[in-house]
């Protein structure tokens, strides 16, 4: 959501920034089973699923060298577009070559993206050029 809003603002105000996002799919790291809520109030069903599959079905995960490819594509390819989302191209975006991924419907709500930006500015005490600097 933040990447979408950054790209939108960059185009609107002429910042010259291309912003996109990427995800690694199912990759052999602990990213899916750790995080801000890990170990606090019990594991969610999704955390239990990831933990189970990571432990008992490691073949379902791609290695780190393949998992990083969507992020590398998004950051370095001249074909990567601002406002796009990249991930593995295979079934369910779990594994495969880097390709354009599906942006979740909830992440495409422009008013929510603007709100996230505003809250981020408020929480960090940072603002960026706005009106008057438009392209």
Map each language-model feature to its residues.
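NAD(P)H-dependent oxidoreductase Rossmann-fold/reductase module
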Residues: 1-135
């Amino acid at each position: 959501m933040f990447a979408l809003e950054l790209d939108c603002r960059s185009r609107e105000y002429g910042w010259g920034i291309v912003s996109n996002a990427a995800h690694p799919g199912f990759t052999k790291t602990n990213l899916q089973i750790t995080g801000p809520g890990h170990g606090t109030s019990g594991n969610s069903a999704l955390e239990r699923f990831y933990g189970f599959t990571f432990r008992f079905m490691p073949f379902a995960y791609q290695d780190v060298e393949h998992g990083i490819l969507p992020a590398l594509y998004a950051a370095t390819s001249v074909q990567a577009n601002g406002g796009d989302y990249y991930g593995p191209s295979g079934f369910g975006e779990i594994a495969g070559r880097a390709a354009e991924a599906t942006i979740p419907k909830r992440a495409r709500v422009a008013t929510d993206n603007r709100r996230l930006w505003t809250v981020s500015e408020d929480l960090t005490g940072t603002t960026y050029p706005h009106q008057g600097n438009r392209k």
